[in-house]
Amino acid sequence: MTALVQEISRSKLKIKAAAAGRTMVRDIQPISDIVQKTGVPIEVYAFIGSSPIRLFAEDWDVSTLMGHIEDSIKFSVNEGLEYCLVTEDTIRSRPEVLDPLFRRAIDLGAF
């Protein structure tokens, strides 16, 4: 990833770098490290499972999802990173689960 963003900068490419990770600070920290090292912005696309199947398999509830989302967005915003929340298996997710997640993400600075 470092070499990629350095090439984007060196070649003056008119594209934005983006990286995906889970909604966990330990996944976003390396992205921030690359931004700090290179000075090239990288958009963060952070994903979390939100379907009933994923909630059951992980033994999660909405408050667990919210905690992961809040921690990762606060970290990203503090690091100056643009953040986009991505929900996995969204088609099977319930609106009453998705609504508070996306509203909170937007409130905290996600785009």
Describe every region a protein language model picked out.
Residues 17-21:
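A glycine-rich helix N-cap at a beta->alpha junction
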